Each structure stands twice: as structure tokens, then as C-alpha cells.
Amino acid sequence: MNDKHLPDASAENPWLPLRQLTPARIALGRTGTSLPTRPQLDFQYAHAQARDAVHLPFDHAAISDGLRQRGRDSLLLHSAAADRHVYLQRPDLGRRLDEASVQRLREHAAGYDGQIDLAIVVADGLSALAVQRHTLPFLERLEEQALAEGWSLSPVVLVEQGRVAVADEIGELLRAKMSVILIGERPGLSSPDSLGLYFTWAPRVGLTDAYRNCISNVRLEGLSYGMAAHRLLYLMREACRRQLSGVNLKDEAEVQALEGEAPRTGNFLLARD
């Protein structure tokens, strides 16, 4: 038998150089007609990370301690979803606070003097890992810029078993002009720790997603903390000027290089020296 025309048992993909530009699963190579062992194991590991991110307990104490060290207050609340099982089965319960949390927030709001421009909410969502990794460094960038512009911020409200819409109820109870919720996004196979920001003008119970603006994939391998804060502040300024948010408010913030960040070319395929 002549083996001269048989393909190599193991062959690399010609797109291999592109792997340095993206964590996406491209140019994995092959062994015979299948994937090599390493990509197979990496896929299984990524799938396990994504599953773990969904079920990882929310370490709110670590976030609260980090905020306290920076002189920031926090308030711990709980959604109407009693535990993780209920949270995953009943999304509607994750969108509202439980009765004890409503009462606590009302008492806090009653003792607060002055207008809150932005209610800041942090919820575990579908990835507590994302919240624990990125909340403190992102808030440091946001608060630095927001306070420099004269915005008044609420204490950071931490919500266990929270969904995006829980920020509407919190913003309404605090009588805030705007709200933003930092929440763990649904894990992907290359991004188990992606943080999402959802911004709303005039938050109140009953709003739909059409009234929210989303800034997604906030993490070291995605949208930087500084750029995410830059985009959020743009939305805040425009929302106050136009008295709206959501589909009628487009994110037209200028994308520019921030200090310590590489300039963006607009095309990830164009390698930079």
C-alpha cells in the first residue's frame, strides 16, 4: 500500500497566527479527522468553568470590605428568589426584592437627604465570578470620574440572586434619577467572567428591556474598566439632557485610547507591533 497520498496524522491550521488576537476557538488543528487532545481537554475545562460560574456563591462580604476600605458604604439585599435553584427556575422572582429588603431600603431612603443622581446596584446574576473579579476595579474608575463631574452616587446596593430588573425597584425606592446594575452575564465557553452594565433613566418597576442601555463584556480580555466607565458616563450625560434611556438613546461615545490602554484600530485582524 502506498501511503504517499495520505494526509498527515496531525496538522496545524494555517489560521494559527490569528489565535494571538482572540480567545475564540479557531485554528485548533487536527489529528486525523478529529481535534487534537489538547483542544478537546480545553473545551471540557471551559465548559466546567462556565457551569461553576453559574453556581458559585456570591462573596458579597469581600466586595463590601473592599468598598469599606475606600470609604464607600454598601447595603446588602436579597431578591424574592430564595435560593439558586429558585433563581434559575423563576426569573421573575429575581427581578423583585423580598419584603425584608424592601422594608430595609425604604428605611434607608427615608434617612437620606438630597437627590441621588445614580443608584449603583451589584447583583450576582449568572456569574458571581464576574462580579467578584471586576466590580471593585470598575467602580474605582467609575467613581473617580463621576465624582469629578459632580454626580451624586448612592451607597452600593448588593443583591443576592438578582436579575437585571431588580435595579428598577431599587432606583425607584431610592428616588434616584438613574440606575446602573453591575451583573454577571451568562458564561460563555471563553468568557466565564464577563460583567454586564445595564443603565436606566427614571427607574421604576415595570420597565422593559427597551428602556435600558447595555454595556457588555466588561473584563480584562474584553471592554476595559476605563472604557466601560467612559461609555456609562456618556449615557448618564445624554440621559439627563434628553430625559430618556434605552432604544432611543444610542451610545455614540467617542472611542479613544485611555491612559494605559492600547489604541483601537477598529479591526482585530490587524496586528499591532
From Swiss-Prot:
One of its GO terms (molecular function) is ethanolamine ammonia-lyase activity. GO terms for biological process: amino acid metabolic process; ethanolamine catabolic process. Its cofactor is adenosylcob(III)alamin. It holds the Pfam family EutC. Its main location: other. Adenosylcob(III)alamin binds at V164, E185, C214. InterPro entries: EutC, EutC_C, EutC_N. Pathway: Amine and polyamine degradation; ethanolamine degradation. Binds between the large and small subunits. This is Ethanolamine ammonia-lyase small subunit. It comes from Pseudomonas aeruginosa (strain UCBPP-PA14). The gene is eutC.
